[in-house]
Amino acid sequence: MNLEIITQLVVLTLVAASGPLVIALLAIRKGNL
């Protein structure tokens, strides 16, 4: 396992995990829930 591959996987997982969270936060702020 190269360090570059590990960092890319970590970044991808962070983006995939933060995506729905950001959308949920924006929805809560706008009151669309």
Curated annotation (Swiss-Prot):
Write out the transmembrane intervals. 8-28
Q: Does the keyword Transmembrane apply?
A: yes
Q: Which family does it belong to?
A: Belongs to the Psb30/Ycf12 family.
Q: How does it assemble?
A: PSII is composed of 1 copy each of membrane proteins PsbA, PsbB, PsbC, PsbD, PsbE, PsbF, PsbH, PsbI, PsbJ, PsbK, PsbL, PsbM, PsbT, PsbX, PsbY, PsbZ, Psb30/Ycf12, peripheral proteins of the oxygen-evolving complex and a large number of cofactors. It forms dimeric complexes.
Q: Name one GO biological process term.
A: photosynthesis
Q: Which GO terms describe its cellular component?
A: chloroplast thylakoid membrane; photosystem II
This chain belongs to which protein, by name? Photosystem II reaction center protein Psb30
Q: Is Plastid tagged as a keyword?
A: yes
Q: Print the keywords alphabetically.
A: Chloroplast, Membrane, Photosynthesis, Photosystem II, Plastid, Thylakoid, Transmembrane, Transmembrane helix
Protein's job: A core subunit of photosystem II (PSII), probably helps stabilize the reaction center.
Question: What are the subcellular locations of this protein?
Answer: Plastid, Chloroplast thylakoid membrane
* Lipid bilayer topology: Single-pass membrane protein
